[in-house]
């Protein structure tokens, strides 16, 4: 009881506007609500201890782990339903909430021949530009329909299943068949 009281007191929460995610919420049902909480000290220590800058697989694994631990979805949804394209954005929102301040990302500006900073947020990052593709979007089914085929973005669940399949197959004797 006391632990829950202190959690409510110190753990920050924030509702994510799914229309500001890279997927723009186009592939989620209208009733989905995503709420994030600030990361725990254990989450941060685990991430920092195991972070390997040059191993993208490890980086993605720990990003997903932190998102899974610090996300609450409306009833009927689970972590695996989140679209893969949204995971990094949600992770950075968790970091921003945890730190209590904006995140500045450093990039190299070729025109100025120097490093520049840009504040992370939906105003500065536009991941999905639909253009003429929007004419194929089915608002009822929340997907694109082209020549009778429905298309949507892969979810974390699909991505994880495919990754696990490839890991298992790569360990088998005939793994060269999958390259």
Roles of regions detected by a PLM:
Residues 1-179:
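Long C-terminal interaction/binding lobes of large macromolecular proteins
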